[in-house]
Regions:
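Two-component/phosphorelay signaling modules centered on CheY-like receiver
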Residues: 11-30
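Acidic catalytic/metal-coordinating carboxylates
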Residues: 34-37, 60-63
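His-Asp phosphorelay/catalytic-motif detector in bacterial-type signaling
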Residues: 46-49, 72-76
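Active-site T/S-Asp motif of two-component receiver
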Residues: 52-53
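The feature encodes the CheY-like receiver
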Residues: 57
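Short amphipathic alpha-helix used as the core "switch/output" element in two-component signaling
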Residues: 62-73
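Alpha4 helix (beta4-alpha4-beta5 surface) of REC/receiver domains from two-component response regulators
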Residues: 63, 83-101, 105, 109
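Hydrophobic/aromatic residues positioned on beta-strands within the core alpha/beta folds
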Residues: 79-80
Length: 115
């Protein structure tokens, strides 16, 4: 079972994403409300995947993704936002993330395509 850490500053989205992913067979092992706590949680929990919001209150998701993926054995990172991927272009590719899924398109199948 793929383990997941959800990093997003909106508790409602974290709860919705948790329910959706758990219903599709993922094991959500943690949640974090901002970039710094997400980096710490990724190091402590060792998830297979970090679902990471682009817009966080302390750090942007692109820099968080770079920090998480810089370590050997790092989890896969998938960026997400309520905005469309075309708004971010090369920032996604340069972040070390596997890809981007808009929040409205989030599903286990969409994540599996990126892993």
């Amino acid at each position: 079972m793929t383990t997941v850490l959800i990093v997003d500053d909106h508790p409602t989205f974290r709860a919705t994403a948790r329910m959706l992913l758990e219903a599709e067979g993922y094991d959500v092992v943690g949640e974090a409300p901002d970039g710094n706590s997400g980096i710490v949680a990724a190091g402590e929990l060792h998830p297979d995947l970090v679902l990471l919001d682009v817009n966080l209150p302390d750090l942007d998701g692109f820099s968080v993704a770079q920090r998480i993926t810089a370590n050997q054995g790092a989890p896969a990172v998938v960026l997400t936002s309520s905005r469309d991927s075309s708004d971010f272009g090369p920032l996604v590719a340069g972040s070390g993330a596997r890809g981007f899924i808009s929040k409205g398109e989030l599903s286990g199948a969409a994540i599996a395509e990126l892993l």
